[in-house]
Amino acid sequence: MSFRKVNIVILVLAVALFLLVLHHNFLGLSSLLRNEVSDSGIVGLQPVDFIPNAPQRVVDGREEEIPVVIAASEDRLGGAIAAINSIQHNTRSNVIFYIVTLNGTADHLRSWLSSSNLKRIRYKIVNFDTKLLEGKVKEDPDQGESIKPLTFARFYLPILVPRAKKAIYMDDDVIVQGDILALYNTPLKPGHAAAFSEDCDSTSAKVVIRGAGNQYNYIGYLDYKKERIRELSMKASTCSFNPGVFVANLTEWRRQNITNQLEKWMKLNVEEGLYSRTLAGSITTPPLLIVFYQQHSTIDPMWNVRHLGSSAGKRYSPQFVKAAKLLHWNGHFKPWGRTASYTDVWEKWYIPDPTGKFSLIRRHVEISNTK
């Protein structure tokens, strides 16, 4: 074989090797990109949707991702939409929303988001399997309403957000007026898996529930007549906290098996009735109070200005409401309901349902009255 032919063979082999390496790298890049925009299925909590069509500043990976978990039930879907809209509008951070729903709500939610100015947000829709709650909750005949499975989604944050080290959970009855990055950057003390806003803080006045006493200490949530509660040596006068908004250190949550601890107390309550009947409907707060007793950090009180839903009257000045970083309509008077306080603030962020399935009750009433 001539020297020229040898050179040609070597050149062909070199080109083939180059193409092989290039092909291998391309496959690796494709795999990496697929991993960036999808998660594998999880038994019980199934991610079914992910929208990566956000501005490049969000998806290029140079900013830390801020996971925000919100539960969205069909009958309260407008609340979740308003909350998400307020968060997205008031930040330039890399936020991804984990929206937890039950079967049947995903299509409605997806349609709502895709038909509004929220169509470019990053989000995942996660179906919550109610079988997770079997043996852990039971219907109380004295309660006027049935159990709401999605209220327990907050107990399963490490499963909902499997890759995150930190996350924010918030209820659907909130409006965020500050930059969510500030809440995400809440410092947590070593060994603490979560940071809550305590009910005794200076900005959220103590709420007196008719016939129920004060909703700001442990005795309002736990039955101190039960031996199992007394043997925990928790002071009944300890200030409670509100679990409707909190920041979680998921690494610490996993290390301490917080979810398993919460499930333990849920099961014990089913067997022994450990929760106080003083505050009707408080079925998610008691196990959290037990597990996080003197083992939680605190968030800035302005990041959970609550009790806006405790009555239809206005308890705060307009100046204070405007200064709040997060407004929380916890209580029976929801901002999408028949009567509520500060509805003008909430409606600023509400996006009408393009399908017409969800509508504001008070508007419905107003229209009926004009006929």
Swiss-Prot record:
Localization terms from the record: Membrane
Single GO term (MF): UDP-glycosyltransferase activity
Membrane topology field: Single-pass type II membrane protein
Main location: membrane
Keywords, ordered alphabetically: Glycoprotein, Glycosyltransferase, Membrane, Signal-anchor, Transferase, Transmembrane, Transmembrane helix
EC number per UniProt: 2.4.1.-
Enzyme class: transferase
TM annotation in the entry: 8-28
Glycosylation: residue positions: N103, N257
InterPro entries per the UniProt record, alphabetical: Glyco_trans_8, Glycosyltrans_8_dom-fam, Nucleotide-diphossugar_trans
Residues in the Lumenal compartment per record: 29-371
Highest taxon, organism lineage: Eukaryota
Pfam family, one: Glyco_transf_8
Cytoplasmic compartment spans: 1-7
Record-level GO cellular component terms: Golgi apparatus; membrane
Record family assignment: Belongs to the glycosyltransferase 8 family.
Name under which the protein is recorded: Glycosyltransferase 8 domain-containing protein 1
The organism of origin for this protein: Bos taurus (Bovine)
